[in-house]
């Protein structure tokens, strides 16, 4: 959240944050402390609604549990209908594994939120979770074109459920032309797809 606000502010966007939790470290560490702010989320929504707040965009990120996703959905239903753009970063896992703190029910609720989004930005693991795909089917693919074709099809499958655009982040592959390991993001919008990448 702190990193995102800095970037948004530098772009001239006034952010109105709603923290979902305070963590001593990110969830990739074995030991961290998490203070959930679930009980505060509805109070934020009610306060903004009473103020007749209008947002140009809503950007969701880390949620500590499925109850928080329920609050995110309620907030999106309140303000998204007022033409606010909805971007969902469905934080659930990485490198083929779901983060241990998240349940199957959590992932189901995240699918529900993702369906409401204008843009959803999963990494490859999260894309597999959202589309109920076995990550192992993809992880050993070495052919760049085949890998990107499969990822694009999964993104299209997700788009059929609701989001207009799917941006799959952190895709690692070996470039067929120069043999160099690269990492990139694949944006899929309708019949268009754009891959941006750089050397690892």
PLM regions: where:
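Conserved N-terminal subdomain of the carbohydrate kinase-like
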Residues: 1-100
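Conserved phosphate/ATP/ADP-binding segment of small-molecule kinases
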Residues: 101-193
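Residue-identity detector for glutamine
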Residues: 11-14, 26, 43, 68, ...
């Amino acid at each position: 959240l702190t990193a995102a606000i800095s970037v948004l502010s530098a772009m001239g966007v006034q952010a109105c944050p709603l923290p979902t939790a305070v963590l001593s470290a990110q969830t990739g560490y074995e030991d961290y402390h998490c203070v959930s702010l679930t009980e505060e989320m509805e109070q934020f929504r009610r306060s903004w609604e009473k103020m007749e707040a209008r947002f140009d965009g809503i950007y969701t990120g880390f949620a500590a549990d499925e109850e928080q996703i329920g609050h995110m959905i309620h907030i999106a239903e309140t303000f998204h209908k007022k033409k606010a753009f909805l971007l969902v970063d469905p934080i659930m896992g990485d490198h083929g594994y779901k983060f241990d703190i998240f349940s199957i029910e959590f992932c189901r609720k995240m699918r529900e939120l993702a369906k409401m989004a204008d843009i959803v930005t999963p990494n490859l693991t999260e894309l597999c979770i959202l589309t109920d795909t076995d990550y192992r089917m993809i992880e050993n693919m070495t052919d760049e074109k085949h890998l990107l074709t499969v990822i694009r099809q999964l993104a299209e499958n997700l788009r059929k459920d609701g989001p207009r655009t799917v941006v799959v982040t952190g895709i690692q592959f070996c470039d067929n032309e120069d043999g160099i390991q690269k990492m990139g993001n694949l944006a899929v919008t309708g019949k268009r797809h754009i891959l941006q990448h750089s050397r690892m």
